Amino acid sequence: MVREKVTVSTRTLQWKCVESRTDSKRLYYGRFILSPLMKGQADTIGIAMRRALLGEIEGTCITRVKSEKVPHEYSTITGIQESVHEILMNLKEIVLRSNLYGTSEASICVKGPGYVTAQDIILPPYVEIVDNTQHIASLTEPIDFCIGLQIERNRGYLIKTPHNFQDGSYPIDAVFMPVRNANHSIHSYGNGNEKQEILFIEIWTNGSLTPKEALHDASRNLIDLFIPFLHMEEDNLYLQDNQHTVPLSPFTFHDKLAKLIKNKKKIALKSIFIDQSELSSRIYNCLKMSNIYTLLDLLNNSQEDLMKIEHFRSEDIKQILDILEKYFVIDLAKNKF
């Protein structure tokens, strides 16, 4: 095995890109280093940066489709090879780049026969398509394929509501995250009290922004989160006369579990990493050591399985359930926590 060598600063804290490549129109990769850091600083920065990269950066997605000719989501239309549901899933995968604030409208109007791709979407001037070749539908007959689209810029996830819409509109589960994945690793060097660290950060994006842009946006978001602490006044440190207090309801484990089981949703479990939820560092590290990285990995373990993890406690399972209820409505199988 050949050991890689990188040149690092010995005094001034600096970062630089050591690798950058474009694997496809919808997959960019970048690797960065930050050094020199004192012992423990690399892990602190790496964990915060990964969470910011995966959860704090905004992206643009198609969140709703409107067509008055479609009776319901799982119907089929004569002259179109795909079902309505398949078309919605294809539209969900369209990668957009924009400076949009809030929501905007777009449309598609194509006459068959032929293929409908992302390049057929009529967009406002401030929205771009990353990959024009992305497939949407196959028209097998000379029919008009006309639909309206709602585009939204946001962060995290948008889970569609379960009820039917009478106006012919169909919401789409949206994953706004432009960063597909992010990892960090640490290399230590030096001896004794002179020991220092190098932080490596790897970033994969969907092409709507480069890894370097993602690193910049994540850094800015972290800075914005910490700025209020610099302007904190002494008078604001304590609550007086019970003002601005929030009552907390008692936690009942079985009630929480029953509520989660009752509410059923389908979401992209493989795309949700456990460190994007607000788990404590201790719980996250315990799960990571057991090769549990995504929500799908987590839900494939029963309560008994989790209790076998070293240093895992029943209070940790309660915290996980609380977070699942807060952010997701999930179909939990019987005997799964």
UniProtKB/Swiss-Prot annotation:
Role played: DNA-dependent RNA polymerase catalyzes the transcription of DNA into RNA using the four ribonucleoside triphosphates as substrates.
Organism: Solanum lycopersicum (Tomato)
Record key words, sorted: Chloroplast, DNA-directed RNA polymerase, Nucleotidyltransferase, Plastid, Transcription, Transferase
Gene Ontology MF annotations: DNA binding; DNA-directed RNA polymerase activity; protein dimerization activity
Region (Alpha C-terminal domain (alpha-CTD)): 265-337
Lineage top rank: taxon: Eukaryota
Annotated segments matching region Alpha N-terminal domain (alpha-NTD): 1-233
Pfam families membership: RNA_pol_A_bac, RNA_pol_A_CTD, RNA_pol_L
Quaternary assembly: In plastids the minimal PEP RNA polymerase catalytic core is composed of four subunits: alpha, beta, beta', and beta''. When a (nuclear-encoded) sigma factor is associated with the core the holoenzyme is formed, which can initiate transcription.
Enzyme nomenclature, EC number: 2.7.7.6
SMART domains: RPOLD
GO BP, one annotated term: DNA-templated transcription
InterPro entries in UniProt: DNA-dir_RNA_pol_insert, DNA-dir_RNA_pol_RpoA/D/Rpb3, DNA-dir_RpoA, RBP11-like, RNAP_asu_C, RNApol_insert_sf
Protein name per its UniProtKB record: DNA-directed RNA polymerase subunit alpha
Annotated compartments: Plastid, Chloroplast
Family affiliation: Belongs to the RNA polymerase alpha chain family.
Catalytic activity: RNA(n) + a ribonucleoside 5'-triphosphate = RNA(n+1) + diphosphate
